[in-house]
Amino acid sequence: MTNKVIQRNIHISHRKASLVIDLVRNKPVHEAIRILSNTPKKFAPIVLKLLNSAISNVQHNSKDMDPSKLYIYKIVANQGPTMKRTLPRAKGSADQLFKRTTHLEIVLSDDVNEREKELAAIKAKKSKKPLAVEPIAKVETKKVAKPSKVEIKPVEKDENVDPELLKREQQVLKVVEKTASQKEEETTETIMISTSPKNAQVLFDDLEKNVIFYKTTPINKVLRVLVYVTSPTKKVVGEFDLESVEIGAISSIWRKYSKQSVISKKEYDAYYEGKDKAHALVSKKAYKYRNPKDLSEYNMTKGPSGFQYLK
């Protein structure tokens, strides 16, 4: 059996303490007392006092141990906390002092084979195998089939389709290279404008929203307006017959057409920021193409920045 005593925070360096404890390690207690009593070191009386305390503890409290067979089984001096202080020097400077401490530990034993027993216990602990953990059976999960893409079937001939829509879809229009003048008012009556996908959807799907706003409008008389949708669609998605074009102050145009507008008041104000006039294009009837058309069908490579005459 063993008996352990500890004294903490002894005001001495653990390196100086090690010089003393190395003299008595694994020695019988009576021999250790003789060595410490004749060692002229500051730490020797401290070790001797703690050793006598350990012997007294065995004699009075450990009935299972034989005091006559005691020896120092383990003795260590571990480093404790270090206190930092300063020493004043010349010219206002200071040197730093380190006041080190030591923790002294002494373990006594009466069994000569104590070391072998301790090593055997460690080996036995390491040799114990951990309990086998049964592997968790994998749960097979069925893969959910992805929904197949819905194919848009072409419109059959017998479906109820507006003949006017069919006529407009089949009509071939090309870009007018030169800008229309007042003399071409009777012959030039179709234009193409650009708008966002959101505005186009509102224009063609909501019958009550039939007014689209622009910053400029053509001089010539226009009866038909094709609608080109910007990114990501980038196609002509439909057209509408133009009922009228009204130009006026920004506030008055909004008061008149706010309920019919395809955009909100916030978008309207942002669109006409810094402008004096607003241009309202009022749709009489809108036609949404069943199959949107590419710009190449109109001999165009990019969408109109303002409006483009077609013929």
Swiss-Prot record:
Determine if Ribonucleoprotein is one of this entry's keywords.
yes
Known role = This protein binds specifically to 23S rRNA; its binding is stimulated by other ribosomal proteins, e.g. L4, L17, and L20. It is important during the early stages of 50S assembly. It makes multiple contacts with different domains of the 23S rRNA in the assembled 50S subunit and ribosome.
**In the UniProt record, what gene is named as encoding this protein?**
rplV
Q: Which NCBIfam families match?
A: PRK12279.1, rplV_bact
List GO molecular-function terms, semicolon-separated.
rRNA binding; structural constituent of ribosome
Q: Does the keyword DNA-binding apply?
A: no
Source organism superkingdom: Bacteria
The organism that produces this protein has a lineage beginning with: Bacteria, Bacillati, Mycoplasmatota, Mycoplasmoidales, Mycoplasmoidaceae
Family per similarity comment: Belongs to the universal ribosomal protein uL22 family.
Alphabetized, the UniProt keywords read: Ribonucleoprotein, Ribosomal protein, RNA-binding, rRNA-binding
Sorted alphabetically, the Gene Ontology BP terms of this entry are: translation
Q: Which HAMAP family match?
A: Ribosomal_uL22_B (MF_01331_B)
Tell me what this protein is called. Large ribosomal subunit protein uL22
What is its quaternary makeup?
Part of the 50S ribosomal subunit.
Q: What is a single cellular component term in the Gene Ontology annotation?
A: cytosolic large ribosomal subunit
